[in-house]
């Protein structure tokens, strides 16, 4: 049987390396290409077209390493977000502590998926990629922009500790 007729190896290798890293008490980090269609990550944390995501159980909730995509919930800067990454965009998985892991080689199945997704995205209207997860609205509604610098915390003098009995 020709390799092009087989299902992609990436989801199976990803799950195997993930389990292996956890079994060795290492922190699994996922490298994602954010330029590919279908990637839903907090873009403000992306650098040079990539983002590195900590997918350790203590860092994410509802992690799904499916055959077609990686999905989970996580907090970025204290804000809960839902992350969805097609397997075509997963470039590598490695350990934070020592770099052990692997980079994934290109696979024909993902090249086809990416070209199909590009065609669909070109013909589709602009869609909202992110949505509010818990339905809460912001406490204030002002004209601040996400690119503005956050306000500085008030400087009140020396910090103090109290004894609570």
UniProtKB/Swiss-Prot annotation:
Extent of Basic and acidic residues compositional bias: 134-143
Gene Ontology process terms (BP): positive regulation of protein catabolic process
One cellular component term from this protein's GO annotations in UniProt: cytosol
Signal peptide positions on this chain: none
InterPro entries: SspB, SspB-like_sf
Pfam families xref list: SspB
Region feature Disordered, mapped onto this chain: 119-165
Domain of life: Bacteria
Task of the protein: Enhances recognition of ssrA-tagged proteins by the ClpX-ClpP protease; the ssrA degradation tag (AANDENYALAA) is added trans-translationally to proteins that are stalled on the ribosome, freeing the ribosome and targeting stalled peptides for degradation. SspB activates the ATPase activity of ClpX. Seems to act in concert with SspA in the regulation of several proteins during exponential and stationary-phase growth.
Family: Belongs to the SspB family.
Subunit structure: Homodimer.
Protein name per Swiss-Prot or TrEMBL: Stringent starvation protein B
Taxon lineage: Bacteria, Pseudomonadati, Pseudomonadota, Gammaproteobacteria, Enterobacterales
